[in-house]
């Protein structure tokens, strides 16, 4: 746009399509013998003599010697069933998918309006906002207008773009802004509270949890991320 005076390019910056990532992870887990349950929820998590068991809404009981809780903002209620306090608040973020001729081919963070634009296949994702309105997926039209207006300042062509999809997600945010990563109880680990950095911090989080589960040393600074 004409009001843009400059930009900073990070040569080592990378982006990922979360939907593709989930598909690849699902296939990898299945290939390693992992079981994936969909269309049901965890109603109860409780201890038993050999570890942990989760009672599903389908009636199935899933038993495990060791448990890793990574349920995003819903980790708080599940951790409470286990006797662990993990205080979090859902922070709603909006995502609008559009079809735009001549769309950017690299991801960009528009600092002033705090909006991110990311190519996703043939579409462009415009995402942003941080709305504290509890556990709901209501879409506020004013938030959507603010989101698109912020992007239009930098990309005027968005004004005539074809809208394809609109949705929102709940980010798990802690009071300190730090994620909660580590052993919560004997045989149980927790990894949650990453806010807007979930995908970015996922590999490092996975390594911390895996090293701790295998008895490998973890950095001293990881102590401040431990569940309390």
Model-predicted segments: where are they?
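Generic structural signal for well-ordered, non-membrane alpha-helical segments
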Residues: 14, 18, 22, 71, ...
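Helical element adjacent to the flavin cofactor pocket in flavoenzyme catalytic cores
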Residues: 2-66
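Short, conserved active-site loop motifs that form the nucleotide-linked donor/cofactor pocket
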Residues: 33-35, 124, 188
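Hydrophobic/aromatic beta-strand patches that form the interior of the parallel beta-sheet core
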Residues: 37, 68, 189-191
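C-terminal catalytic lobe of FAD-dependent flavoproteins
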Residues: 18, 112, 152-228
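Active-site substrate-recognition segment that forms the wall
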Residues: 44, 51, 61-62, 66-186
């Amino acid at each position: 746009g004409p009001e843009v005076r400059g930009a900073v390019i990070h040569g080592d910056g990378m982006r990922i399509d979360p939907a593709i990532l989930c598909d690849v992870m699902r296939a990898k887990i299945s290939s390693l013998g992992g079981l994936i349950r969909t269309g049901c929820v965890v109603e109860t998590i409780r201890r038993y003599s050999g570890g942990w068991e989760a009672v599903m809404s389908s009636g199935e009981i899933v038993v495990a010697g060791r448990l890793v809780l990574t349920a995003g903002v819903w980790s708080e209620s599940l951790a409470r069933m286990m006797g662990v306090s993990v205080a979090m608040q859902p922070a709603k973020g909006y995502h609008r998918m559009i079809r735009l001729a001549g769309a950017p081919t690299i991801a960009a963070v528009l600092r002033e309006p705090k909006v991110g634009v990311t190519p996703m296949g043939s579409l462009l994702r415009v995402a942003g906002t941080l709305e504290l309105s509890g556990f709901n997926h209501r879409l506020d039209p004013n938030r959507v207008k603010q989101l698109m207006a912020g992007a239009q300042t930098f990309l005027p062509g968005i004004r005539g773009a074809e809208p394809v999809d609109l949705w929102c997600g709940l980010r798990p945010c802690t009071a300190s802004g730090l994620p909660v990563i580590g052993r919560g109880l004997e045989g149980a680990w927790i990894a949650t509270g990453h806010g807007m950095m979930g995908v970015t911090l996922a590999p490092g989080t996975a390594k911390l949890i895996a090293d701790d589960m295998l008895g490998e040393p973890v950095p001293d600074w990881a102590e401040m991320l431990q569940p309390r």
